From Swiss-Prot:
This is Exocyst complex component 6. GO terms for cellular component: exocyst; Flemming body; growth cone; perinuclear region of cytoplasm. Component of the exocyst complex involved in the docking of exocytic vesicles with fusion sites on the plasma membrane. Together with RAB11A, RAB3IP, RAB8A, PARD3, PRKCI, ANXA2, CDC42 and DNMBP promotes transcytosis of PODXL to the apical membrane initiation sites (AMIS), apical surface formation and lumenogenesis. Belongs to the SEC15 family. Keywords: Cell projection, Cytoplasm, Exocytosis, Protein transport, Transport. GO terms for biological process: exocytosis; Golgi to plasma membrane transport; intracellular protein transport; vesicle tethering involved in exocytosis. It comes from Canis lupus familiaris. PANTHER family: EXOCYST COMPLEX COMPONENT 6, SEC15. The exocyst complex is composed of EXOC1, EXOC2, EXOC3, EXOC4, EXOC5, EXOC6, EXOC7 and EXOC8. Interacts with CNTRL. Interacts with RAB11A in a GTP-dependent manner. InterPro entries: EXOC6/Sec15, EXOC6/Sec15_C, EXOC6/Sec15_C_dom1, EXOC6_Sec15_N, EXOC6PINT-1/Sec15/Tip20_C_dom2. It is found in: Cytoplasm; Cytoplasm, Perinuclear region; Cell projection, Growth cone; Midbody, Midbody ring. The gene is EXOC6.
Length: 803
């Protein structure tokens, strides 16, 4: 059973191997057969048996197939035997056809030989014709020359002439027509020279007309390149956290004016910028240069071209008389010059020898000297700072454009520093008007604020810092008036305006910082100081206004340090940098304060004089009124109110003003007594006058301004007091006895003053006692007066002799 089962398992395997042998390539049969021997023992015998059985099966199939196709094979052989007859007939026909083709070919050979003979004859005829017609190419070339002349192809015509002379004419020189052609060529050359020169003149006229457009295009390209570079620099600086105040324009809200608008008027949407080749056809120059080169007269052409261009340069450099009136006048002037030198630079690079670098440098140096002289002269007429600024921007773009073409422009930037001084002068004049307007519009009263918003609005304009003021509740008032923040803002605007000119001057931030500080110093020390002094001296400015002006200058002086920090910030200078220039605000505002203080003293004295002029004493009264004069009480009340306003002033200023007022009042009262037009004074008038002086002394002792020590202010009236005491007490014996002694009771009474007043009283006594002169008391008093007068005169005479 085991053997049977093993045999049953082997049979399918042998069948698989047989199928694989039948279906596999012969080269791969080896491994398959090897698997038979690798199997169980005696397996190959069984396989051989299986293989024999398979072969017998295939033999049977072959036999069946042969039996099936045998009849067809017999039929095919039979058909072949039938076709043999037809094949023999076909062979006969092919042989006949070949014979007939051979016969026909003989005729073709004969005809071909005839054709060859004809070709040989034709070639011989052509050779003869060519030998006879040597002149034809000459005529054709000459005809071509005429066509080239008609088509204005003069350079080609000259080349054709060279070919005729060098190649064609020698072949037919024996013919008369050739001699005529040879004689006509020089005339044609002269015609070409004249025509090309005419084209050159037209070209020169054309570029003169197109210089504006060429220069405008070149300057626009330079402006765009500069804008791109600035934007790139800005991007880099922003990336690395740097400020870009100078080259980026200061804050965004500041308007850019300036010239980009002038160059973008024509076609704002034009994406492709035209080049000089697009604007000007240079072919006439090239043709003329080539023609003169071919003619061997290149030097004549170069000399003529350079001479004409120098003439055009002089015309371009000649400005219009009213060029300084508008920026367009300057722009046309610059674009023409740029256009001229752009053309010369193009000619320099595309031609060889027509212009040289030495020639263009010489031409540029001549032009540069003329340009600087013209700009220096015309810019001096400019009074508008905006126009001067636009001129500066034009000069910068003009210089940058030509520098891009290789022309040195350092002298132009040196000129800009001269123009910068003029620009600052125009700015100073403009800001003088601005300051005057601010002062005229100011109400010279402290700025009132009622809420936090108003407080912040003022603080945003002016750097006011006072902790005590911040603690006060609303409503409250800033100590300064409206003009202070306005002036501070305008000083910053001036710095911005000055900085505008300093941009693009190829200077370091430190130099620009120094220039800004110098310009600001001029604004403070000259313009603002002058405006303040003029304001202080105006007749309508009263004491209250002068007090406010002093307060204002104090706060402006304190703000100068913030202006210095502001300049440092916008120029991006390190705080540690030692500045060679400082702001002179301290001296400027101190001088203004001194002037205002002096004006306060003057106006206060004038006001006192106005009150004193209202005095109406009855110098002959017998008895006083018992009360002070009305004018004097009004004057004292006025002084009290004024000195209350002075509480905001620095202590020394208020004290000086108060002392000056009291001294002036004392002097005015003394002059009133000693007036030469006043001839008589009664004792009653002296007593009334004494009541007024007492009120003055009471005013002085009331300390109208704090800070006086003891009776310092009352000493202003000491001369009057001692004089009036002398006359009212009639203490002449003491005065005369103690005169000249340091401890004298009447030390401040001058003998001349006492004599003058005593004579006025003596005359009054004579007049009043004309009928009572025989009274003993009156006679004694009169004698005493006369005696005192004599002694006083002796003292006065002694003083004069001693002097």
């Amino acid at each position: 059973m085991a053997e049977n089962s093993e045999g049953l398992g082997t049979v399918p395997e042998h069948e698989r191997i047989l199928q694989e042998i039948e279906s596999t390539d012969t080269a791969c049969v080896g491994p398959t057969l090897r698997s038979v021997y690798d199997d169980q023992p005696n397996a190959h015998k069984k396989f051989m048996e299986k293989l024999d059985a398979c072969i017998r099966n295939h033999d049977k199939e072959i036999e069946k197939m042969c039996n099936f196709h045998h009849q067809g094979f017999v039929d095919a052989i039979t058909e072949l035997l039938k076709v043999r007859t037809d094949a023999e007939k076909l062979k006969v026909q092919v042989t006949d056809t070949n014979r007939r083709f051979q016969d026909a070919g003989k005729e073709v050979i004969i005809q071909t030989e005839d054709i060859i003979r004809c070709r040989i004859q034709q070639r011989n005829i052509t050779t003869v014709v060519e030998n006879l017609q040597y002149a034809f190419p000459v005529l054709e070339m000459y005809s071509k020359l005429k066509e080239q002349m008609t088509a204005k192809r003069y350079y080609s015509a000259l080349k054709t002439m060279e070919q005729l002379e060098n190649v064609y004419f020698p072949r037919v020189s024996q013919y008369r027509f050739c001699q005529l052609m040879i004689e006509n060529l020089p005339k044609l050359r002269e015609d070409i020279k004249e025509i090309s020169m005419s084209d050159l003149k037209d070209f020169l006229e054309s570029i003169r007309k197109h210089s504006d457009k060429i220069g405008e295009t070149a300057m626009k390209q330079a402006q765009q390149q500069k804008t791109f570079s600035v934007a790139l620099q800005k991007q880099n600086n922003v990336k690395f956290g740097k400020n870009m105040y100078i080259n980026d324009r200061i804050p965004e809200e500041r308007k850019e004016n300036e010239l980009k608008q002038g160059f973008e008027e024509e076609d704002e949407n034009e994406e492709e910028i035209l080049t000089v080749q697009d604007l000007v056809d240079f072919s006439p120059v090239y043709r003329c240069l080539h023609i003169y080169s071919v003619l061997g007269d290149e030097e004549t052409f170069e000399n003529y071209y350079r001479k004409q261009r120098k003439k055009q340069a002089r015309l371009v450099l000649q400005p219009q008389s009213n060029m300084h009136e508008t920026v367009d006048g300057y722009r046309r002037y610059f674009t023409q010059i740029v256009g001229f030198f752009v053309v010369e630079d193009h000619i320099l690079h595309v031609t060889q020898g027509l212009v040289t670098r030495a020639y263009t440098d010489e031409l540029w140096n001549m032009a540069l000297s003329k340009i600087i002289a013209v700009l220096r002269a015309h810019s001096s007429y400019c009074t508008d700072p905006d126009l001067v600024l636009e001129l500066k921007n034009l000069i910068v773009i003009f210089a940058d454009t030509l520098q891009g073409y290789g022309f040195p422009v350092n002298r132009l930037f040196d000129l800009l520093f001269e123009i910068r001084d003029q620009y600052n002068e125009t700015l100073l004049k403009k800001w003088a008007g601005v300051f005057r307007d601010i002062f005229e519009e100011d109400n010279y009263s402290p700025i009132p604020i009622v809420n936090e918003e108003e407080y912040k609005a003022v603080i945003s304009k002016f750097p006011f810092q006072d902790p005590d003021f911040e603690k006060q509740s609303f409503p409250k008032k800033f100590p300064m008036s409206q003009s202070v923040p306005h002036i501070y803002i305008q000083v910053k605007e001036f710095i911005y305006a000055s900085l505008k000119f300093s941009e693009s001057l190829h200077r370091s931030s430190t130099e620009i910082d120094d220039m800004l500080r110098k310009s600001t110093n001029l604004l403070l020390t000259r313009t603002l100081s002058s405006c303040l002094l003029n304001l202080i001296r105006k007749p309508h400015i009263g004491l209250t206004e002068l007090v406010q002006i002093i307060i204002n200058t104090t706060h402006l002086e304190q703000a100068c340090k913030y202006l210095e920090d502001f300049i440092t910030n916008i120029t991006n200078i390190s705080q540690e940098t030692v500045h060679t220039t400082r702001l002179y605000g301290l001296s400027t505002f101190k001088d203004a304060r001194h002037a205002a203080e002096g004006e306060i003293y003057t106006k206060l004295n004038q006001k006192i004089d106005e009150f004193v002029q209202l005095a109406d004493y009855d110098w002959t009264m017998s008895e006083p009124d018992g009360r002070a004069s009305g004018y004097l009480m009004d004057l004292i009340n006025f002084l009290r109110s004024i000195f209350q306003v002075f509480t905001h002033l620095p202590g020394k200023v208020a004290q000086t003003a108060c002392m000056s007022a009291c001294q002036h009042l004392s002097t005015s009262l003394m002059q009133m007594l000693l007036d030469s037009e006043l001839k008589q004074i009664s004792m009653g008038a002296v007593q009334q006058f004494n009541l007024d002086v007492i009120q003055c002394e009471l005013f002085a002792s009331s300390e109208p301004v704090p800070g006086f020590q003891g009776d310092t202010l009352q000493l202003a009236f000491i001369d009057l007091r001692q004089l009036l005491d002398l006359f009212m007490v009639w203490d002449w014996s003491t005065y005369l006895a103690d005169y000249g002694q340091p401890a004298s009771k009447y030390l401040r009474v001058n003998p001349n003053t006492a004599l003058t007043l005593l004579e006025k009283m003596k005359d009054t006594s004579k007049k009043n006692n004309i009928f009572a002169q025989f009274r003993k008391n009156d006679r004694d008093k009169q004698k005493l007066i006369e005696t005192v007068v004599k002694q006083l005169r002796s003292l006065v005479n002694g003083m004069s002799q001693h002097t």
